[in-house]
């Protein structure tokens, strides 16, 4: 017997420049959330600084570690999605929302490993595994193919990026893009969907792919914006990430809301349902 297709939420199409609207809405959310949004950026920047401190004399490892760190960014931004959702529902976006996102729903379902309550944890573990794989691959690639040991950022610039002979940097970028593209397609709206709705990991990932297939140019533009702003954040000695990461996190929530009609799926908890009804009626 043929398998029954998995029912997925309806996917919408958007215009090419719609990602710019998501960024504008993200700045509005950052202004309304105040310090709690920027605290996320500060925490992510501090974590990036820790990576830098540990691996600064091993740039062959650092290049992969920093880029791999960005692979798990959709998980780290989970509570930013929750803050934007609270603001959308005309609720307070405060520390309580953040703590509830990271602690309460997991703690109340500790005995339900394997079902949809743990999808966010499982997806985070998969992204972390992908990031680790990229770190190892990148380190091996640079170590084996670089003409001299790459220990500092200047070594990386001189012997990889600006090398006169060979295509090492282009190959490194191509390999990274080849690995990053399916991760982006799998995660572009998956985490906000898992936060908002009671969906399986398979449904979230397939819906994310469906979004990319239905909106190839807007999603390519969105990916380019994410990459560009992230490079600006990294290029400012990580300080720019204090602003960039909250902005991209809030914007990702608005991307999800624009791109997916998830009304066919049940809300993740009753508390959210109550909040949505009160938000709409007020």
Segments from the language model and where they lie:
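Hydrophobic alpha-helical membrane segments
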Residues: 1-282
């Amino acid at each position: 017997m043929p398998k029954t297709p998995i029912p997925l939420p309806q996917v919408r199409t958007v215009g090419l420049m719609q990602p710019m609207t998501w960024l504008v809405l993200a700045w509005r959310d950052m202004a309304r959330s105040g310090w709690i949004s920027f605290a996320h950026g500060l925490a992510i920047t501090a974590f990036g600084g820790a990576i830098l401190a540990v691996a600064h004399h091993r740039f062959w490892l650092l290049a992969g570690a920093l880029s791999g760190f960005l692979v798990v960014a959709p998980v780290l931004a989970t509570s930013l999605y929750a803050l934007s959702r609270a603001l959308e529902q005309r609720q307070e976006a405060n520390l309580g929302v953040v703590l509830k996102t990271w602690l309460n729903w997991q703690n109340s379902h500790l005995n339900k490993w394997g079902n949809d309550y743990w999808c966010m944890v499982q997806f985070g573990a998969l992204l972390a595994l992908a990031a680790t794989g990229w770190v190892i691959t990148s380190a091996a690639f640079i170590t084996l193919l670089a003409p001299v040991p790459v220990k500092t950022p200047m070594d990386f610039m001189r012997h990889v990026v600006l090398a006169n002979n060979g295509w090492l940097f282009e190959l490194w970028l191509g390999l990274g893009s080849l690995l990053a593209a399916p991760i982006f397609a799998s995660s572009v709206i998956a985490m906000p969907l898992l936060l908002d709705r009671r969906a399986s990991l398979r449904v979230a990932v397939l819906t994310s792919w469906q979004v990319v297939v239905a909106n190839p140019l807007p999603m390519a533009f969105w990916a380019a914006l994410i990459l560009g702003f992230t490079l600006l954040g990294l290029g400012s000695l990580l300080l720019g990430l204090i602003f960039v990461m909250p902005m991209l996190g809030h914007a990702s929530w608005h991307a999800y809301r624009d791109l997916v009609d998830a009304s066919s799926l049940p809300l993740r908890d009753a508390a959210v349902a109550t909040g949505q009804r009160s938000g709409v009626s007020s």
